[in-house]
Design a protein with these regions (language model features):
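Extended, regular secondary-structure scaffolds
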Residues: 43, 59-142
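Hydrophobic/aromatic-lined pockets within catalytic cores
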Residues: 58-62, 72, 163-166, 202
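Active-site cores of enzymes that catalyze phosphoryl transfer or operate on phosphate-rich substrates
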Residues: 102-202
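Short, well-ordered loop/turn elements at secondary-structure boundaries
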Residues: 36, 50-53, 58-63, 69, ...
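Catalytic cores of large soluble enzymes that bind and process phosphate-bearing ligands
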Residues: 8-10, 41-45, 150, 202
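Single conserved hydrophobic/aromatic residue that forms the stacking wall/gate
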Residues: 1-9
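Well-ordered mid-protein domain cores that form the structural environment of catalytic cofactors
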Residues: 14-55
Length: 202
């Protein structure tokens, strides 16, 4: 995904007008754009293709929703040291992101693992109950996908993960610190990075 501010101006075909207006006030639009971090949601081939699909749907005027994961470190930042490329984590959410809207009212519990138990109901139907599972709370964030020169705005909904319980005090009191923060670590692991280096055996 590209940076939101310049993208909106270009798609509404007002970029040059905004740039000229700011220049009259002694403000450089490019300097403002540089303050916005790139959404580090991953930049692989499939991710880029999905972004192009979303932009095309908006430009063609088709109403659409896209879904993805709100990776905290989806890409890396690079710099040159002693003539060599050095990769660093890109914490693009460190200072917040202005083109996303948190929607906690649409959170869902997502369950992992466990087992399913069948229960016979009085009306003869069978009810299936999942037990012994781990779960996280999925929280959506809306990002606008603006069509080109047509006043159409679709939505990319990216999902973050939060623990159902941030801290298990009972486990902590028993000296089991790892168990106390297990839920927190599970949520964090799901959204921390897009994928690890594939040079190592999983």
């Amino acid at each position: 995904m590209s940076r939101g501010l310049g993208d909106v101006y270009k798609r509404q075909t007002v970029y040059n007008e905004v740039k000229e207006a700011l220049e009259e006030m002694g403000i450089n639009l490019n300097a403002i754009e540089d303050q916005e971090p790139d959404p580090a949601l991953g930049n692989g081939g499939l991710g880029r293709l999905a972004a192009c699909f979303m932009e095309s749907l908006a430009t063609l005027g088709y109403p659409a929703y896209g879904c993805g994961i709100r990776y905290h470190y989806g890409m890396f930042r690079q710099k040159i040291e002693n003539g060599y490329q050095v990769e660093e984590p890109d914490n693009w959410l460190q200072n917040g992101y202005p083109f996303e809207l948190k929607r906690p009212e649409y959170n869902f519990e997502v369950k992992f693992g466990g087992y399913v138990r069948a229960e016979a109901q009085p009306d003869g139907r069978t009810r299936f109950v999942q037990e012994g599972y781990q779960s996280v709370k999925a929280i959506p964030y809306d990002m606008p996908i603006v069509g080109y020169n047509n006043n159409v705005v679709n939505t990319l909904m990216i999902w973050d993960a939060e623990p159902m319980e941030c801290f298990e005090l009972d486990s902590f009191d028993k000296g089991d610190y790892h168990r106390a923060i297990e839920q927190q670590n599970l949520a964090k692991n799901l959204v921390e990075v897009l994928y690890p280096n594939d040079n190592h055996i999983a």
